[in-house]
């Protein structure tokens, strides 16, 4: 039938032309609420207020018809049949773009996206990477699964071309991360959960992460400075140590004992007693030595006397015999 033939021709034509992005498709995926048609109609005019648009897995072959998405921040186009990156210059506020698992062969038409920070081009057909087609605002880039990643020196070249890049192919660029007591890295995961997991997952609204990263770094620096200043202002604590007992000289026992009455007099008295006993021992030793010395002197005198008396006795004996 003629009608059936025309429908078949239109279907074939649509297949050749591919599936395009339309307002109806955007509304269906992002503004439709099943069972509440009134609400859907009310939300239709808010198309320009959308900040996150999800069009993944729709078989889309061409990018277009995005002019009304004036406030969009995040665009999900993964798992489609897109062959070219195009028609994105009209959404300059875009920060997150996922084009993973498509049929893209070249990186192009991205320089107008001056605020783009996250770009996922994994699992495509990119053989030659044109670095000058990538916006320098990128913080995270994923090219895993593309032939270009096998090129010698690929990682070094990409890092050199993108001065703000923090993560390439799910591998952090360590030299560009602030290494703070290494760390506290869980703080980053808590503050920026968007940095974890595959880019194709739903993440909700993205705030201005560049500003957040800057503020996070400032907070760390301020905390370090505060800690440093607090350490500099801390005064050393002087501990009251007990005084060592003094060893008084001979004759100072009484004065020392009377200077500090009460509890402190007891140890002083003890030390005085020890000193007195030591003095007595020395005196007794001196007395013993003097007695011994006297005995020795008497013995010497006696021996001399006996020696002197011996010749006199001899003389007396001789005199008697003569008589």
Curated annotation (Swiss-Prot):
Region (Disordered): 249-323
Bias (Low complexity): 267-316
Positions carrying Phosphoserine: 179, 185-186, 303
Keyword field contains Transmembrane helix: no
Gene Ontology CC, one term: sperm midpiece
Keywords: Cell projection, Cilium, Coiled coil, Differentiation, Flagellum, Leucine-rich repeat, Phosphoprotein, Repeat, Spermatogenesis
Positions in coiled-coil regions: 203-228
The protein's name in its UniProt record: Leucine-rich repeat-containing protein 46
Organism: Mus musculus (Mouse)
Gene name of the record: Lrrc46
